[in-house]
Every structure is written in structure tokens, then in C-alpha cells.
Amino acid sequence: MRYRQPIPIWNDANLEDLASSLHADLYLATVRSATPGLGVGHYNTQPFRYQNWLFMHNGYIRDFAETGRPQIRKILAHEFEANIQGNTDSEYIFALILHFLENDDMTQAIVHAFSILNEILGQQSALLNVMLSDGEKIYATRYAINGLSPSLYYGANVEGFAPDSQLIVSEALSDSTHWQVVDEHRLLIMSRDDELVELAL
């Protein structure tokens, strides 16, 4: 299930009732500010979905409309460009990763997409903390081009959460000592049955 609203979370009268009725082994949740200059609507609201993949992005590509978007559009297969409904840098990053997923596994698709972004952006900055899931695994990055990426934390068995739960979050949600800062240029791979995998990007 995917639930999106383009309104501030505190104005969403349905959220409390909805949240109390949800039960799952894996959740992705995002609360984001709108990007100045881009339309506010469902089409620009995360998480984005393609088939069984969900995608979220914390960051930006500077001057995306002038630099990133035209270059990414030259690369994308028609199938993935046609699936784009909004105009955010986030949705184009997702499409670029999906483009490379056609011939790679997800880890390699992320590496390939970030490598291409490094090439096409030149001296422009980009903050690329992304999270993807197919319902079985979560892939999360802390990464930046010509900048310092937003924070990312991993926590296991954190007080106040379900026993044996694992969390990947942008900000530590408590003063617990169980939170670990994820280093810059890292990819985390989390699954239900395996140990957390951390790879350098």
C-alpha cells in the first residue's frame, strides 16, 4: 500500500486513523518540504512507485531543470521516461536507477546511476540520500556530489520500537545510544533475514 498527501503532515486528518490500522514487517515513510519553484501535487509527492519498487529521496540536484533533467532525459529508455508524472529531480533520479536496473542488480544500478550523475553534473552540487525497497530489501544511500550529504542513521533494538526492529532514518529519533551514524558515500542493504550490509560508494 502507498499513501501520499501533498499537504503538511499536521494538516492530514486521516493520518492518525490510518497509521493505527497498519500492520506490516516493512515500512517506508517520508515527510518532506516542497521544493521551491516546483508544483505541489500528488504527482510530485514521494514515495514514487514503479512496479514493486518504492523510492524516496532526501536532497536535491542544484539547478536541476537547466542541468540535470536534459542530460538524464538523453539517457533514459522510453519506458522509464514515459512513467515520469511529475517534474522533480527525485523522480528523475528514480527513473535513472530503474533504467540501469534493467541490466544490473539494484546495488550496481545505484552505483551506475550515481556515476552518471557525477559525470553530467560537473561542478553542480547534488545531495543524494535515497531509499528504495521491493518489499524484501531496503537500499539506502548517504551520498553527495560537490557537497556534504544529509545525515543518515541506523538503529537496531532502539527503545520505544518493536523488539528486533531495524531502522534507517535521516535523524536520530531519540537519545538512545543504539543509533549509529552512517558515513558519507555509503550504501546500506537491509533485509529481514540477513545481517545489515554496508558498502562504500
For the regions a protein language model found, what residue spans apply to each?
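Conserved short alpha-helical segments that host acidic/polar catalytic motifs at enzyme active sites
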Residues: M1-L54, R62-L201
